[in-house]
Amino acid sequence: MLTVISPAKTLDYDTPPVTERFTLPQYLDDSQELIVQLRELSPAQISELMHLSDKLAGLNAARFGSWTPDFTPANAKQALLAFKGDVYTGLDAETLSEDDFTYAQQHLRMLSGLYGLLRPLDLMQPYRLEMGTKLANARGKDLYAFWGTRISQWLNQALTEQGDDLLLNLASNEYFSAVKRSALKGRVINVDFKDLKNGQYKIISFYAKKARGMMSRFVIQERVNDPQQLKQFDVQGYYYSAEQSKPDHLVFLRDHPAE
């Protein structure tokens, strides 16, 4: 089973990584093509394009300017440890074992507007470029056009390497839309996490994001390779709902959010 998750806007390059192992991103030629274009934008243009404050626009203009295709532990960090935010709070990668990292390297992928697709131990230089950004480029009107079917093809390769055709989608709609389903040679399993609020079960963004991270961790630590095993997920009060689920769309409910 191959799990895909979204990246995060929040990054941590201050905390030392808990593992010295690293790999290099596989699609840096594409990343560099985007960087060349992004460097042509002023901070004001970045602010308008990405809907950022002047401060954040300036920060990311500087990031694009200092980006280099030569990745080292001195200027980059393993992607799974660099990303922060709700999903990564739930995943809590800093407490994974070396064996867990080995498993994750084969069975987990992070979608990215700049890097396309990242493995957990791929070094990543800091950036901000959401997949939904309408950055016109030589390949089309936005990043979905830029990546085209590439991400699907790379996922097909990863599915082949890890031994089955099961793709667990724990990414947001914005990011999974970069996966062209017509080009994907795998069975996609979608998951929803719903919390009880005002008498109804609803998807609450903050809780759902964290739950995606917790399920990603569950898959890694339990070495899950069968959709039936996913139904055993019961972290922080979630439980599988057979009534609301379908074979390729699993629903988990929670009656009381964990403190």
From Swiss-Prot:
GO terms for biological process: response to hydroperoxide. It comes from the Bacteria. GO terms for cellular component: cytosol. NCBIfam families: PRK02101.1-1, PRK02101.1-3. HAMAP family: UPF0246. Belongs to the UPF0246 family. PANTHER family: PEROXIDE STRESS RESISTANCE PROTEIN YAAA, PEROXIDE STRESS RESPONSE PROTEIN YAAA. This is UPF0246 protein PputW619_0896. It comes from Pseudomonas putida (strain W619).
